[in-house]
C-alpha cells in the first residue's frame, strides 16, 4: 500500500529540511545512513527504525556531472566530512551506508566514492527506483529531476518495470540563467536559489523540455499517478506546468522535494540491509 503523502511523507520531508546542517533530533539505535551524490549537492541523511530523519548534512558542491564523478577527491572529502559530523553529533560509528546512481550509469561510480571514504555499501539502487520504493507505489510514474539528469521510473504492481535517464536537470537551468543574465555559472546557481520566482519566465522553456521528455517515456505505460522528486522541482511554477502538461494524471509534488531522494536512499538501507546500521 502506498505511503500517505500528508501523514507519512510530508512530515518526514519537513523534518529533514528542519534538521539540515542543524543539531540532530533525539534518537535511539538502530540508525541507518544514506548518501546522495548529486550534481549540485551531496546530502547525507540518517534515519531511525521508523524511517524518520534524525540528522542531515548538505553541501552544495560541483563534484558530479551527468552521473559521472569528475572531482573524485572532492566527493570523497565531502563524504568523509559528513561522516565525521554525523558520528560526532550522534555519538555512534557508521560502517555502512546506502547510495544510488542515475539510471543507465555505472553504480560503481557512487560505490567507489563511499568505499574510499571508509564505508561499506549496505544497498545501492537507481534514484527513481529508490523514490518509487519509498512511496510504495502501484501503477505510477516517478520523475526525479536532479542537478544534472532527469530520471524516470515506471512502477507496475509495486515493481519498477522501466527506468531511464536524460541529461537535463538543474545544471541546465543554471546554464540558461547564466546566458540570459550574462553572469558566471556559479553566480547563476546562487541566483537561482535566491530569486526562484523572478527567474521562472527565463527557465520555463527548460522545464517544458523536461515535461516533453517525461511524456515520451511514460507514453502508453498506463500509469495512474505521476510523482515529482528532486531539488530542481522546488522551482515555483514546476508543479503547475506538469499538471497542465498531464491533465489526465494526478501530479504529486511534495514540499521539500530536494530531500526525497536522500530520504529514499536512507530508507532503502533500512529496509534492505537489516543489521547494517550504526554501532
Predicted regions and their residues:
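Short beta-strand scaffold segments in enzyme catalytic cores
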Residues: 42-47, 150-154
Amino acid at each position: 500500500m502506498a505511503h500517505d503523502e500528508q501523514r507519512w511523507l510530508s512530515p518526514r520531508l519537513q523534518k529533514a529540511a528542519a534538521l539540515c546542517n542543524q543539531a540532530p533530533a533525539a534518537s535511539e539505535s538502530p540508525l541507518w545512513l544514506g548518501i546522495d551524490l548529486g550534481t549540485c549537492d551531496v546530502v547525507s541523511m540518517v534515519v531511525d527504525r521508523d524511517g524518520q530523519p534524525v540528522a542531515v548534512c548538505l553541501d552544495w558542491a560541483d563534484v558530479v556531472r551527468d552521473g559521472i564523478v569528475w572531482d573524485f577527491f572532492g566527493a570523497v572529502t565531502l563524504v568523509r566530512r559528513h561522516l565525521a559530523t554525523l558520528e560526532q553529533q550522534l555519538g555512534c560509528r557508521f560502517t555502512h551506508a546506502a547510495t544510488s546512481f542515475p539510471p543507465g550509469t555505472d553504480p560503481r561510480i557512487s560505490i567507489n566514492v563511499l568505499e574510499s571514504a571508509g564505508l561499506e555499501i549496505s544497498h545501492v539502487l537507481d534514484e527513481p527506483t529508490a523514490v518509487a520504493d519509498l512511496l510504495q507505489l502501484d501503477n505510477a510514474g516517478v520523475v526525479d529531476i536532479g542537478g544534472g539528469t532527469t530520471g524516470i521510473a515506471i512502477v507496475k504492481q509495486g515493481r519498477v518495470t522501466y527506468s531511464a535517464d536524460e541529461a537535463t536537470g538543474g545544471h541546465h537551468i543554471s546554464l540558461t540563467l547564466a546566458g540570459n543574465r550574462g553572469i558566471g555559472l556559479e553566480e547563476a546557481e546562487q541566483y537561482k536559489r535566491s530569486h526562484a520566482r523572478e527567474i521562472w519566465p527565463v527557465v520555463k522553456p527548460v522545464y517544458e523540455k523536461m515535461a516533453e521528455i517525461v511524456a515520451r517515456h511514460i507514453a502508453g505505460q498506463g500509469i495512474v499517478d505521476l510523482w515529482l522528486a528532486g531539488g530542481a522541482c522546488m522551482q515555483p511554477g514546476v508543479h503547475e506546468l506538469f499538471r497542465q502538461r498531464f491533465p489526465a494524471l494526478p501530479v504529486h509534488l511534495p514540499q521539500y522535494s530536494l530531500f526525497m531522494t536522500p530520504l529514499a536512499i536512507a530508507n532503502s538501507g533500512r529496509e534492505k540491509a537489516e543489521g547494517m546500521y550504526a554501532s
